[in-house]
Amino acid sequence: MESGKPRKVKGLLGDELAWADFLISKASLVLASAVLFAAVFQLAVAFKGLEAQEELDFLARDFKAAVDNVGADNFPGKTQEISYRFDENEVFLASQFGEDIEVYVSGEYVHLKAESGGVNFSAVRPFTFRVLPFNEAELRGKLYARFGNDGSEKSPLSVDFQEIIEFLRVSGTEEALLSADEDISIKKEFVYIRGSEEVSAFEYVLVYQ
């Protein structure tokens, strides 16, 4: 009987070790699954964020293209005007942002801001042509207040071209906030300047609501 006891204890110890190994393996499997799930979740979040950024980039490019197209139209002395709506764009309607996209326009760029899932997104695209973020009445008013004439065909400016350009550049640096769910006017206008022999004109694209 004495000789059988050690074998029984040894058998119990073996069972306990096997059970411990099983629990450790089970815990390792659960931990590995949790790590894998976390990795997949992070990958999904990263992909969703990348998709959101691509949507905002597309909308910024599309708006820039609309402004640049008006600037590129070549009908000397004639104004061009279109209306642009973000909420008529399929990407805008299907985007993760809903209608919560802020549209900022300055004389140099369009800047879109949006938020999705607690993350802020931003997209900036520079304009190709000279742009001003206000309407024609404001343009004429600013020119008249500064130079005494409003720069229209009937009231051309009689100052240095570079002085006018610099004045309007500074005037257009402040961003204007536009509503994405309303018409945005994009209009080409001309500023007339009187030279020593003739009156000439240069173009601006006005972006406003």
Regions found by a protein language model. Name each.
Residues A38-Q209:
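Long, compositionally biased, intrinsically disordered regions
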Residues E2, K10-K48:
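N-terminal single-pass transmembrane signal-anchor helix
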